[in-house]
Regions:
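Eukaryotic scaffold repeat domains enriched in small/polar residues
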Residues: 1-99
Length: 99
């Protein structure tokens, strides 16, 4: 039997800076500090929030193709992304430095 997580929508949780938008979110992950990472196809970037929905940072604008496909956080808090536009899996620090 598969274990399926349950999610609850919290209206107004996400607080993006002015000018930031996103449409296609193809991955969501959390790290050990309860930061939430969205992998978006809009501007091909990762957007990071704190647990209360406050914007922390974004990164990846010059790295990804418009066909990003997923994101995961390892037990060491490294960020792993999948991009099927260039058939890559990449590893990053939580701050967005590619390793």
């Amino acid at each position: 039997m598969a274990i399926v997580p349950k999610f609850k929508v919290i209206e107004g949780w996400e607080k993006l800076p002015k000018g930031y938008v996103h449409k296609d979110v193809d991955g969501v992950a959390t790290d050990s500090q309860d930061r939430v990472y969205l992998m978006t196809r809009q501007d091909a970037r990762v957007i990071v929030y704190d647990r209360d929905g406050n914007f922390v940072r974004s990164w990846g604008e010059e790295i990804f193709t418009p066909r990003t496909h997923g994101i995961a956080i390892g037990p060491d808090d490294f960020v792993y992304t999948v991009d099927d536009g260039d058939h890559t899996v990449r590893k990053f620090t939580p701050e967005g430095k590619q390793l």
